[in-house]
């Protein structure tokens, strides 16, 4: 039962990270004035690195169990 719970949690983490990334991209595209703000660009880059880390960690954890 623990494997099923881990799979559900991992799936939620990956889907959530992807949705947050998509939301940030949509906000950036719809509001072009944000592209001129270097602080916002730095924040977006940091958040995308965190999202990538979550996905990589989750997929790596699943791979090491197999």
Curated annotation (Swiss-Prot):
The name on file for this protein is: Putative transmembrane protein ORF66
Any ranges marked Extracellular in the topology annotation, and which?
28-39
Organism source for this protein?
A: Acidianus filamentous virus 2 (isolate Italy/Pozzuoli) (AFV-2)
Residues annotated as transmembrane: 7-27, 40-60
Task: Write the record's keywords in alphabetical order, separated by commas.
Answer: Host membrane, Membrane, Transmembrane, Transmembrane helix
Question: What is the protein's major site of localization?
Answer: host cell
ATP-binding among keywords = no
Keyword Transmembrane recorded: yes
Taxonomic superkingdom: Viruses
Q: How does this chain sit within the bilayer? A: Multi-pass membrane protein
Gene Ontology CC annotations of this record: host cell membrane; membrane
Q: Where does it localize?
A: Host membrane
Residues assigned to the Cytoplasmic compartment are 1-6, 61-66
């Amino acid at each position: 039962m623990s494997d099923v719970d881990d799979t559900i949690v991992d799936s939620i983490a990956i889907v959530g990270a992807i949705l947050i990334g998509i939301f940030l991209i949509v906000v950036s595209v719809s509001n072009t004035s944000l592209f001129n703000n270097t602080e916002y660009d730095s924040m977006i880059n940091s958040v995308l690195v965190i999202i990538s880390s979550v996905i990589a960690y989750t997929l790596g954890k699943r791979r090491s169990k197999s």
